């Protein structure tokens, strides 16, 4: 994936992950995070390049990058 999100994909992502919704981590490309698959968090917002900023229940605030990381709604 080239990491560039289309306007339509960005709007779909915003609709799927609105602020306040709960998510679970599926995978992340960050080798230094303490997050593991299944960890839960709450979506804060999405930025203009599709990164989902999440307040994780473990206290982390790691964002999930479009094309690199994956979460699912719970």
Located regions from the model:
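Basic/aromatic-rich interaction segments and small domains that mediate binding to polyanionic partners
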Residues: 2-74
């Amino acid at each position: 994936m080239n990491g560039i999100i289309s306007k339509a994909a960005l709007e779909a992502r915003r609709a799927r992950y609105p602020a306040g919704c709960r998510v679970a981590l599926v995978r992340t490309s960050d080798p230094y995070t303490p997050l593991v698959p299944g960890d839960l968090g709450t979506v804060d917002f999405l930025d203009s390049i599709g990164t989902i900023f999440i307040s994780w229940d473990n206290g982390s605030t790691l964002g999930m990058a479009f094309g690199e990381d994956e979460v699912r709604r719970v």
